[in-house]
Amino acid sequence: MPLLDSFKVDHTKMQAPAVRIAKTMTTPKGDLITVFDLRFCVPNKEIMSPKGIHTLEHLFAGFMRAHLNSDEVEIIDISPMGCRTGFYMSLIGAPSERRVADAWLAAMHDILNVQDQSKIPELNIYQCGTYTEHSLSDAHATAQHVITRGIGINKNEELLLDESLLTE
């Protein structure tokens, strides 16, 4: 099986919270797609709770769209990483890492303003596969963690994993 791009960066060097351009590609029609690594937690040292990351998933996507979508940028998807240290965001366009970081920070403030679990979007048996598995307090703790630390930028050239360490 081919080695995925996300496994070609040294996770021991990643800063968090931080934005990284994980991948760019151009569609056959010429649209630029950018995939961002939005790293909330330091890999192998910190982790988001399952209920907290699930709640963030419901809140973060809408708030990021409100702060980042424009005539030049349209978010396709924001999905949690299986390792629970961040989210991947795929979008049409090529906003700068700083613009993404600013939108992310604004979204974290928005999350802190959600004061009741009943205000979490799509939190019901019809629209959520595990609608009882949420924690607004865990989502608040993660949002506060990001705000307190600030959001940096991870550069691929600084994280490139030495080829001797690559295993498939």
Curated annotation (Swiss-Prot):
The entry's keywords: Autoinducer synthesis, Iron, Lyase, Metal-binding, Quorum sensing
Cofactor binding annotation: Binds 1 Fe cation per subunit.
GO BP, one annotated term: quorum sensing
Keyword Membrane tagged: no
Disulfide-bonded cysteines: none
UniProt keyword Zinc, yes or no: no
Domain of life: Bacteria
Catalytic activity, reaction form: S-(5-deoxy-D-ribos-5-yl)-L-homocysteine = (S)-4,5-dihydroxypentane-2,3-dione + L-homocysteine
Single GO MF annotation: iron ion binding
Cofactor(s) this protein requires: Fe cation
Subunit structure comment from the entry: Homodimer.
Family assignment from sequence similarity: Belongs to the LuxS family.
Its job: Involved in the synthesis of autoinducer 2 (AI-2) which is secreted by bacteria and is used to communicate both the cell density and the metabolic potential of the environment. The regulation of gene expression in response to changes in cell density is called quorum sensing. Catalyzes the transformation of S-ribosylhomocysteine (RHC) to homocysteine (HC) and 4,5-dihydroxy-2,3-pentadione (DPD).
NCBIfam families: PRK02260.1-2
PANTHER family, A to Z: S-RIBOSYLHOMOCYSTEINE LYASE
Stored HAMAP family: LuxS
Name of the protein in its database record: S-ribosylhomocysteine lyase
Organism: Actinobacillus succinogenes (strain ATCC 55618 / DSM 22257 / CCUG 43843 / 130Z)
Gene, per the UniProt record: luxS
